Amino acid sequence: MKGIRRNLQKSYLKRCSEMYLRGLKVSGEIVSAKGIYLEAILPFANIGNEVEIQSNSRRIRGEVIGFSGDKVLVMPYEPVFGLRKGDKVLLKNELVSTKTGNGVVGKVVDPFGNPLDGGFIGFVEEKGLELPQINPLYRERIREVFDTGVRSVNALFTLGKGQKIGIFAGAGVGKSTLLGMITRHSKADVVVLALIGERGREVKEFLEEVLGEEGLKKSVVVVSTADQSPILKVKGAISAVVHAHHFASQGKDVLLLMDSITRLALAQREIGLAAGEPPTLKGFTPSVFQLLTRIAESCGAFKKGSITGIFTVLVEGDDISLDPIADSLMGVLDGHIILSRKRAVRGLFPAVDPVRSLSRLMPKLVSEEHFMKANFFKEVLSKFEDVEELVRIGLYKGGSNPLVDKVINNLEKVESFFKQKPEEKVNFEESLKALDEIYSLLK
């Protein structure tokens, strides 16, 4: 009996091999379903190949994510409800791709470049959904300031074109609002915004209230919502990088925004665990940290164009040291803007923490005078922070520290430096002027 089964298997594989070599589509079948992925017999499948699962009532797209013995692991893009053992799996000979080009600017699209409103898109081209490998010698040094349009960021944590930075904060502190301000007010030629794992309700709110009509005009918005397959969330992030590199290759300065890279990590963890990877810190698999590093490294200044990356990072319990994703990204990125819940409660929006935030490239981008004034301001704020509670309950003794006394005497002006309405734009020159005024008050 075993001999008959072995001969049938050899005959099947030979027939599949002939079909594959002749360019015909090879098919197999589902043999089991395990949670969010399927096991199938599918000869000649490669990791990353797209497949189509055909049942009596549905056609579901999916992707090969790994192997287990002689079986192929398939992650469907849609829920597997209604599929059954023996359903046909058709191997597509091409890798997964997305539509990109000028036709998607001003559009809200899925990870494959299809407009979510079902409308028409103009000229586009197909590009594979894979992260680029960038020759380090093709990169240029980052020398030019990137104007975010946000006063506190421009003045105290100046960014450069091609820099990658994270916005770190707990839930509800204003990450998305700050991201929307930078989207609307920055001087980027094209903005690529990836909304990964957002609730469906929040997507519409973000587009209308945070991004706005003006922000959308120069943006490509890639959406993969919380209720979708984890592989679609990962594809959404990769799709955003593909769009960004397409426009950068045309010599444009691109701003790549991702909200949030934490949800991307959670999605990749699901895929990694399903594929049999060993869990490490808090269940995160090795592929999570590799993916985050590759996403971050896709940014930079190139011989043609640049990609400036800003990623929101959801910090568990507002403590970066206890969050493996936040802690890992601190070492991968070129700086961090930390939002403070304490400042948010006091109505200081954007709630940027001036003492803990940092741009590693700032010393190479600004004048010595600018850098000195920014450091002085942060040093003074650090000293004030040490005694702030005493000041607010009336136990601080005036004269203990002359610099702290100056902050107390000018506290309203100091706090107004950080306050900025979402619709208010403050360019780089205006930000420097505001810093000069604060410096003259405190010096």
From Swiss-Prot:
Probable catalytic subunit of a protein translocase for flagellum-specific export, or a proton translocase involved in local circuits at the flagellum. GO terms for biological process: bacterial-type flagellum organization; protein secretion by the type III secretion system; proton motive force-driven ATP synthesis; proton transmembrane transport. SMART domains: AAA. Its main location: cytoplasm. Keywords: ATP synthesis, ATP-binding, Bacterial flagellum biogenesis, Bacterial flagellum protein export, Cytoplasm, Hydrogen ion transport, Ion transport, Nucleotide-binding, Protein transport, Translocase, Transport. Belongs to the ATPase alpha/beta chains family. Its EC number is 7.1.2.2. It is an enzyme of class 7 (translocase). CDD domains: ATP-synt_flagellum-secretory_path_III_C, ATP-synt_flagellum-secretory_path_III_N, ATPase_flagellum-secretory_path_III. GO terms for molecular function: ATP binding; ATP hydrolysis activity. This is Flagellum-specific ATP synthase. It catalyses: ATP + H2O + 4 H(+)(in) = ADP + phosphate + 5 H(+)(out). It comes from Aquifex aeolicus (strain VF5). GO terms for cellular component: cytoplasm; type III protein secretion system complex. ATP binds at A169, G170, A171, G172, V173, G174, K175, S176. SUPFAM superfamilies: P-loop containing nucleoside triphosphate hydrolases. It is found in: Cytoplasm. Gene3D superfamilies: 3.40.50.12240.
